[in-house]
Regions:
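A flexible loop/linker signature enriched in serine peptidases of the S9 family
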Residues: 1, 19-32, 48-66, 77-103, ...
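Non-catalytic accessory segments flanking enzyme active sites
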Residues: 1-16, 22-25, 34-37, 44-49, ...
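Short loop/turn segments that connect beta-strands within beta-propeller blades
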Residues: 5-8, 69-73, 135-139, 179-183, ...
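Residue-level detector of Asp-centered blade-edge/turn motifs that repeat once per structural unit
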Residues: 40-41, 109-110, 158-160, 200-202
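Hydrophobic beta-strand positions that form the internal "hydrophobic ladder"
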Residues: 45, 111-115, 162-164, 205-206
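Short beta-strand element of the alpha/beta-hydrolase
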Residues: 266, 274-284
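Serine-hydrolase catalytic-loop signature spanning alpha/beta hydrolases and amidase-signature enzymes
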Residues: 286-288, 310
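Active-site-proximal cap/loop segments of hydrolase catalytic domains
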Residues: 299, 304-305, 312-506
Length: 506
């Protein structure tokens, strides 16, 4: 709705989407207000909308950017041809019929252009996020990051001739920029850190930055050379009284001859003459980078502080190493990325300080699936497993999740499509089909409000483990979803997490 606000309050508004159009604005499930943007003159509103319903909505990610004009009350879709015909011709400068996610419109200061993020493939939420530029006067589109093999996010204008954005690059998040007239991306910042948000502050940049060893603080960034100067030190009194473990960057050779970046976090006061219990961390997503993130849930330094070496590989399927590396996992859940996990833990296990007789494996979401799958093929590597909201049964998962487009893309299709070799390979390698090989204690977390990977997946896994006679424990949060957010529940989660590891691994 768009309505006037005056001294008497909010006047009756105008439904700019239409009462008969049951469309998401902004998009579910996060309803991010960054998907809605007024122009600077206050005369037009750009917003993200997914103009689909029913089954079409469930199997596609096709959203578009719409622009509503306050003066004439008209709306137009800048991502699709106005006449509904496929008239896209790149050589002629026509607009593409953009079938994937189109999100996050940002107006230029002069209101002549709209920058936004676009994905080419409908149904693939992990397709490359491209930075597009729409000219409001000529209706021409420009893909600014066509030759840049990383995602773009958090787009900010600097004047009307320069765009800054964040990109994941080799397991870090950096500020980049591009002048549309030049067309070449420049990486502004460097280093092992995650810049998660920023804004222009005159001729400087104010940024939020974290590392594996530091929660988010504010930094000043010099756009000329990318130099970062810390502004805030909110947590210094805390850091002054605790010890952090060393974070090592390790390149591991995979079974197919690639190099894989793996973070190794050592316990505080690490002594190379001693042997330490070691954890393999399996990342979720599955297309979600193992970067320099600081988490209140999966905190590597907290694990290290308990005396564990943490091995966190950027296995196949994770962003920041190019789209080919990321795409490989789709249709191959049980394949190369699983071998990548084992390559990482086997490489670290060769170190004299890693105790190969005291190893555990932990992960959430896709990482939870990885735990279930590895439980059936780890060949006695691990003494204990912990799975948080993991996928256990691919067939039942297909009928339970609220993101059907995701399952179709990552599994290859529905389980009943017998002619689809990719899909049939996926379902043939569902973890529940290898339970007869499970022989290792399993702790399982889940949330009753989880609609991404419903808690019934965890119930199935727990039942299977208990019937098999394997030590198993189920921790179910009745008021949590896919993650644990409530502080009291987080305390319970960590107590259970480390209690299990200390009992069976340490």
């Amino acid at each position: 709705f768009v309505g006037d606000f005056g001294p008497e309050g909010l006047r009756p508004g105008t439904d700019i989407v239409g009462a008969d159009a049951a469309w998401d604005v902004p998009l579910a499930p996060y309803f991010d207000m960054a998907e809605i943007a007024w122009n600077n003159a206050g005369t037009q509103l750009a917003y993200t909308c997914k103009p689909l319903t029913g089954t079409a909505y469930a199997v596609s990610t096709d959203s578009d950017i719409f622009v509503y004009d306050l003066a004439d009350g008209k709306t137009h879709n800048i991502c699709k041809p106005f006449d509904g015909k496929a008239r896209y011709n790149a050589a002629a400068g026509h607009k593409p019929a953009m079938p994937g996610y189109d999100k996050y419109p940002v107006w230029s200061p002069d209101d002549r252009q709209i920058a936004f993020l676009s994905q080419r493939r409908a149904g693939n939420e992990s397709d490359k996020a491209r930075l597009f530029l729409y000219d409001c006067q000529t209706a021409q589109m420009q893909d600014l990051t066509e030759d840049f093999d990383y995602n773009a996010m958090n787009v900010v204008w600097s004047g009307s001739d320069m765009l800054y954005f964040i990109a994941p690059i080799e397991a870090t998040h950096q500020i980049c920029r591009i002048a549309p007239s030049v067309g070449e991306v420049e990486v502004v910042t460097r280093g092992d850190h995650d810049i998660n948000a920023f804004s222009m502050a005159g001729d400087r940049i104010a940024a939020e930055m974290c590392t594996i060893s530091m929660a988010t603080e504010f930094f000043d960034v010099n756009p000329a050379d990318g130099t970062l100067t810390q502004i805030s030190a909110i947590n210094k009194p805390v850091y002054d009284n605790i010890r952090m473990g060393e974070v090592q960057k390790r390149w591991v050779r995979t079974t197919d001859g690639k190099q894989m970046l793996t973070w190794v976090i050592l316990p505080p006061d690490f002594d190379p003459a001693k042997k330490y219990p070691t954890l393999l961390y399996c990342q979720g997503g599955p297309q979600s980078v193992v970067s320099q993130f600081w988490s209140y849930r999966w905190n590597f330094q907290l694990m290290a502080a308990q005396g564990y070496v943490v091995v966190a590989p950027n296995r196949r399927g994770l962003p920041s190493f190019g789209q080919e590396w990321l795409d490989q996992i789709s249709g191959d859940y049980s394949g190369q990325n699983i071998r990548d996990y084992l390559s990482a833990i086997d490489d670290v296990a060769k170190e004299p300080w890693a105790d190969e007789n005291r190893m555990g494996c932990v992960g959430a979401s896709y990482g939870g699936y990885s735990v279930y799958f590895l439980a059936g093929c780890h060949e006695k590597r691990f003494k204990a497993f912990i799975s948080h909201c993991g996928i256990f049964n691919f067939e039942s998962m297909y009928g339970q999740t609220e993101e059907l487009f995701f399952i179709n893309n990552d599994y290859g299709g529905p389980y009943w499509d017998r002619s689809n070799t990719v899909a049939q390979r996926s379902y043939a390698n569902s973890p529940h089909k290898f339970v007869e090989k499970w022989d290792t204690p399993m702790l399982i977390f889940t949330g009753e409000y989880d609609f991404r990977i419903p808690y019934t997946q965890s119930l199935e896994a727990f039942t299977a483990a208990r019937v098999r006679g394997i030590p198993a424990r189920l921790v179910e949060f009745e008021n949590e979803a896919h993650q644990v957010f409530k502080p009291q529940n987080s305390l319970v989660w960590n107590r259970e997490f480390f209690g299990w590891l200390n009992k069976y691994v340490k």
